[in-house]
Design a protein with these regions (language model features):
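Catalytic loop of short-chain dehydrogenase/reductase
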Residues: 143-194, 203-207
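A short, exposed helix-loop element centered on a Lys and neighboring polar residues
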Residues: 135-136, 186
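Conserved Rossmann-fold SDR core element
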Residues: 32, 96-98, 182-185, 192-204, ...
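C-terminal helical subdomain
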Residues: 201-202, 219-284
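Substrate-binding pocket helix/loop in short-chain dehydrogenase/reductase
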Residues: 111-112, 116-121
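Conserved catalytic-site loops of classical short-chain dehydrogenases/reductases
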Residues: 14, 98-99, 121, 148-157, ...
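Short-chain dehydrogenase/reductase
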Residues: 2-94, 108
Length: 284
């Protein structure tokens, strides 16, 4: 199957995602909707951000336009009751959950002596705890999906567990938060292996040109040497449509997934056409 396959392979299946109002998460949701999936988004963005486009409502409109039914949930991934209610509403509305995408993430790359504990706690609560919370609450529905032969997956947007001290030394708080997400993948893949639930992580090999990156210092230059969110969306689609029992415990890079499935033209994902150097992403 190529990354551009247009079949509705996810027809009748349901995906629940943390975040997704914009950027990589929205691209993944739109790609899944185009393949027929029902989508639940859990996101805080009820109103527009002053610097970043997109709300959970505009995202829902894009998902519907792509062909998917959507349940937008305005809520905080840090709140247990909100996430539990979103899982319950999803099962009630769509009849189950087949795919969990842990996409919500906070970032602050300040060094340890400059990172306020409030920011540290925010990253741990959204990135690591939020991933654990949504995944664990969805397990009963995912087990039912497996028993029904519906090929359930958990996919977390987090990096390979690279123990080179370079990254921890540069941004310890953020590294702990992202590696916490990856450790959740490692543990749940083993815990749920016998259930036939695929649990994997996905990370971009290069930086991705999102509005959030553009608004950071030097962002315009960074975006120019980045790829578009669609490379992650196409890779995520290929992971969650693979056989769950045979695809678990992996830390995938987006371009590796695509080339393994026969993709040869990765230049179409460049923000800036040409053959100039691309900026590698963190943790690689």
């Amino acid at each position: 199957m190529s990354a551009g396959d247009s079949t509705r392979e996810l027809a009748g299946r349901t995906l629940i995602m943390s975040g997704g109002s914009r950027g990589i998460g929205l691209a993944i949701a739109v790609r899944a909707a185009a393949a027929g999936a029902n989508i639940t988004l859990i996101a805080k963005t009820d109103a527009p951000h002053p610097k970043l486009p997109g709300t959970v409502h505009t995202a829902a409109a894009e998902i519907e336009a792509a062909g998917g039914a959507v349940l937008p949930v305005v809520g905080d991934i840090r709140d247990d009751a909100t996430v539990a209610a979103a899982v319950e509403q999803t099962v009630r509305r769509f009849g189950g959950i087949d795919i969990v995408i842990n996409n919500a993430s906070a970032i602050d790359t300040a060094p340890a002596d400059e990172l306020p504990m409030k920011r540290y706690d925010l990253m741990q609560d959204i990135n690591c705890r939020g991933t654990y919370l949504l995944s664990s609450l969805a397990i009963p529905a995912l087990r039912e999906s497996a028993q029904a032969g519906r090929n359930p997956h958990i996919l977390t947007m987090s990096p390979p567990l690279n123990l080179d001290p370079r990254w921890a030394g540069a941004c310890l708080g953020y590294t702990i938060a992202k590696y916490g997400m990856s450790l959740t993948t490692l543990g749940l893949a083993e815990e749920l292996r016998a259930d036939g639930i695929g649990v994997n992580s996905l990370w971009p090999r290069t930086t991705i040109g999102t509005a959030a990156i553009r608004n950071r210092p030097g962002g315009a230059e960074r975006v120019a040497t980045s790829r578009t969110p669609e490379i992650c969306a196409d890779a995520a689609y290929l992971v969650v449509t693979s056989k769950a029992a045979d695809t678990t415990g992996n830390f995938f890079l987006d371009e590796d997934v695509l080339t393994a499935h026969g993709a040869t033209d990765l230049d179409r994902y460049r923000v800036t056409p040409g053959d100039g150097p691309l900026t590698p992403d963190m943790f690689l």
